[in-house]
Amino acid sequence: MSLQFNPISLFLVVLIFLGVVGNNNSITIAATVLLLVQQTFLSKYLPFLDKHGLSIGIIILTIGVLSPIVSGKISLPSFSEFLNWKMLLAVVAGIAVAWLGGRGVSLMGGQPLLVTGLLVGTIIGVALLGGVPVGPLIAAGILSLLIGKG
């Protein structure tokens, strides 16, 4: 096995460094896994990850969000609790974010060149500002509103 030194592997090493410096496990682990996949016999699975990675990530994120309800750590609110203004605002915020994410998926598919800028912005937010990497879809949705696409 020989290591591939290319701009992408260097980029992944930089991400790992930023993740460690920024104390962000998500970016560190993701970049490390992708570097290992790229540099080993697992590279044959990169097209699969490219095609299905976003969907798999959304499924895993959804499982993480729903698991406290399923485990009983968080109970489902009663109907009267849904009428609380904070709960209604939370529902509206959830609807808005889901809508933005949908617009973002359309924009990312229709204008793949913009994905690079969205990823760089997300990486900066994750590595340096303590954010989490759920931003590209929402960022793409916001961008679609700003540029009138999607």
Curated annotation (Swiss-Prot):
**Alphabetically ordered keywords of this record:** Cell membrane, Membrane, Transmembrane, Transmembrane helix
Similarity remark: Belongs to the UPF0756 family.
A cellular component annotation (GO) from this entry = plasma membrane
Q: Name the Pfam families on file.
A: DUF441
Quote the protein name from its UniProt record: UPF0756 membrane protein APL_0366
Species this chain originates from: Actinobacillus pleuropneumoniae serotype 5b (strain L20)
**Protein location:** Cell membrane
Q: Report the transmembrane regions from the record.
A: 12-34, 52-72, 82-102, 123-143
Give membrane topology per the record: Multi-pass membrane protein
